[in-house]
């Protein structure tokens, strides 16, 4: 019920559309009209979360994908839907950069947006190469970190920080929502990932 006093509610729960929709139904019952609502989803298309929501909710709803851990990582993707009010988008872009000190990027509402579409593709390609070439976890992280100009957390440590469950949900979402992608099969999880 304290949600009614909030200017901005950011959803940060498991990467499952059904659970997010259930939460937004509860949030809508208690929020004040005009308050901002956003999702920190890593890859679920933003418009899919709006089913059953009021016009006011839809106008004030946007994706705000903060990269994890947000206290260290600069990127913030702002993902409006066609129903998001332009003033909300302008506010989030401005607040994200000037107040939060983030590098804000305006994204289209496509599966996994920009960074995770590229990043998860890269990780999945590497996962398949690991299976084919028999690399160990430590070998992969040595070869896919600073030596390539990437963070020292490299691949497997990054997946551990973000959460392997999140990666699995995003990869599955890409496979499910990118039916015409010529490399769609790359998002099929190797067996060893399911065992981790």
Specify the residue positions occupied by each region the protein language model found.
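N-terminal glycine-rich phosphate-binding loop for ADP-containing cofactors
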Residues: 1-196
């Amino acid at each position: 019920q304290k949600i009614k006093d909030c200017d901005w509610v950011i959803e940060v729960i498991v990467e499952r559309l059904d659970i997010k929709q259930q939460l937004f139904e509860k949030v809508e019952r208690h929020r004040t009209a005009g308050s901002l609502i956003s999702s920190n989803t890593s890859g679920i298309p933003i418009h899919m979360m709006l089913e059953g929501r009021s016009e006011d909710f839809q106008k004030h709803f946007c994706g705000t994908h903060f990269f994890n851990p947000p206290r260290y990582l600069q990127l913030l993707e702002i993902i409006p839907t066609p129903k998001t009010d332009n003033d909300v988008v302008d506010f989030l872009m401005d607040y994200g950069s000037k107040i939060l000190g983030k590098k804000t990027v305006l994204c289209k509402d496509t599966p996994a947006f920009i960074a995770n579409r590229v990043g998860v593709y890269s990780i999945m390609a590497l996962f398949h190469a690991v299976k084919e070439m028999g690399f160990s976890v430590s070998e992969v992280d040595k070869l896919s970190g600073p030596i390539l100009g990437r963070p020292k957390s490299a691949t497997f440590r990054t997946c551990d920080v973000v959460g392997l469950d999140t990666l699995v949900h995003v990869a599955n979402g890409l496979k499910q929502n990118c039916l015409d992608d010529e490399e769609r099969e790359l998002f099929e999880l190797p067996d060893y990932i399911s065992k981790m």
